[in-house]
Curated annotation (Swiss-Prot):
PANTHER family found in the cross-reference section: 30S RIBOSOMAL PROTEIN S2 PROKARYOTIC AND ORGANELLAR, SMALL RIBOSOMAL SUBUNIT PROTEIN US2M
Protein name (record): Small ribosomal subunit protein uS2
UniProt entry tagged with the keyword RNA-binding: no
Source organism of the structure: Borrelia duttonii (strain Ly)
Lineage: Bacteria, Pseudomonadati, Spirochaetota, Spirochaetia, Spirochaetales
Family designation: Belongs to the universal ribosomal protein uS2 family.
Length: 254
């Protein structure tokens, strides 16, 4: 069983929002306080978002569907790939190609082409064609692989999508909403939580925070067949929480 503590969230810098001037007013309900012109997120609501997301993910997996991991920003890209691979889920961590969901059949054709080119590399085809042709095929293969490798084994639309930085991934959200695919996302103070089915208030810039949230989703997938849930430990009261919160230069404004 996964155990999440408020202290672990604090240590990962989950509570740090953006500068006050960058607030999306729709995030006000998730704000705990303000320190040095930086918004502090309400970790009680973060814990609730984690719990709701954990339950949704496990429901999706038990119904035989997959969760698509999406995070293309620098801080998230490598983590998204690692955790998606760990839980054997599809992922997009370089660039979202318009239509990856809404025009899925066309995307599948591109994936099939990628698989065909990869097969040519190992079945002896390269030995029967010119070096120039091999070079052209390799260039095309690399171009396709850059954006499609993570979804090569996604045979159907996902049952849910997990997103780091929904403000950046607006095209993903638009496509998912049109198709009725549930969205789980880490929402920072500059995001719109109203377009997310399971918003998790949190810092989407700090690597430790991104890693923590992504690991939680991956753990939920891996534990879905064990009939176990998540244990939330609120091991800090409000007074302790306030004393722990010291806004430092732990996030880079972008």
């Amino acid at each position: 069983m996964a155990v999440i503590t408020m202290k672990s969230l604090l240590e990962a810098g989950v509570h740090f929002g953006h500068q006050v001037k960058r607030l999306d007013p729709r995030m006000k309900r998730f704000i705990f306080s303000e320190r040095n012109e930086i918004h502090i997120l309400d970790l009680q609501k973060t814990l609730q978002g984690i719990k709701d997301s954990y339950e949704l993910v496990q429901s999706v997996i038990k119904n035989g569907k997959k969760v698509l991991f999406v995070g293309t920003k620098k801080q998230a890209s490598e983590i998204i790939e690692q955790e998606a691979k760990r839980s054997e889920m599809p992922y997009v961590n370089n660039r979202w190609l318009g239509g990856m969901l809404s025009n899925f059949n066309t995307i599948k054709k591109s994936v099939q082409k990628l698989k065909k080119l990869e097969k040519m590399e190992v079945d002896g085809t390269f030995e029967m064609i010119s070096k120039k042709e091999v070079s052209q095929i390799n260039r095309e293969k690399l171009k396709l692989a850059k954006n499609l490798t993570g979804i090569k084994d996604m045979e159907e639309l996902p049952g849910a999508i997990f997103i780091i930085d929904p403000k950046r991934e607006q095209i993903v959200i638009n496509e998912a909403r049109k198709l009725g695919i549930p969205i789980i996302a880490v929402v920072d103070t500059n995001c719109n939580p109203d377009v997310i089915d399971c918003p998790i208030p949190g810092n989407d810039d700090a690597i430790r925070s991104v890693a923590l949230f992504t690991k939680i989703i991956s753990d939920a997938i891996l534990e879905s067949d064990k009939e176990v849930g998540i244990q939330i430990v609120e091991n800090l009261n409000e007074e302790d929480l306030m004393s722990e919160i010291e806004v430092k230069n732990e996030r880079k404004e972008s």
